[in-house]
Regions:
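Anionic-ligand binding patches
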Residues: 2-8, 14-162
Length: 162
């Protein structure tokens, strides 16, 4: 076992930071965004969510000396052969923009008869930067991409994922 009083979160996504902080608050774990250490987001060069989450967690843990939690996630649309997938955050290019990403996906699916999709998320927890046994959790949620946004409590593709 390891002492988990402080946990660096390898993300600059304010929505994710807020959700993780809320989830871990009852456990009395201090969630520290990597930006508090002046760590910039690392590139996500890999073709899989697991590899990208692992490289982000290792980078944050190396820079801070703290245990690290990182995720990589995205929406995968069946008609688009899994796109945007690992490119979900930058689907419409740089700089990252939820609004532009959603607009691009709406345009791509405007005439599609099948808008089935799934949201995939991988979370990696490292006890230290060289942890040989990272804790890896995966989640998958099936749904449909809708052209008109709904709701107001989410971020990313949430308004279009039903």
């Amino acid at each position: 076992m390891f002492d988990l009083k402080n946990l660096v979160i390898a993300s600059g996504n304010k929505g994710k930071l807020r959700e993780i902080g809320t989830l871990l608050a009852p456990l009395k774990i201090a969630v520290v965004p990597q930006s508090d250490f002046n760590i910039t987001e690392i590139d996500e060069p890999h073709p899989t969510f697991i590899e990208n989450a692992l490289i982000k967690a290792r980078h944050a843990s190396r820079q801070t000396g703290l245990p690290a939690l990182a995720d990589d996630s995205g929406i995968c649309v069946n008609t688009l052969k899994g796109a945007p997938g690992v490119f979900s955050a930058r689907y419409a290019g740089e700089p990252k923009s939820d609004q532009r990403n959603n607009m691009k996906l709406v345009e791509a699916l405007k005439t599609a008869t099948d808008r089935s999709a799934y949201y995939y998320c991988v979370a990696v927890l490292l006890r230290h930067a060289e942890d040989p046994q990272p804790i890896i959790a995966e989640g998958l949620w099936h749904g449909e991409f809708i052209l008109e946004p709904r709701g107001d409590g989410g971020f990313g593709y949430d308004p279009h994922f039903l």
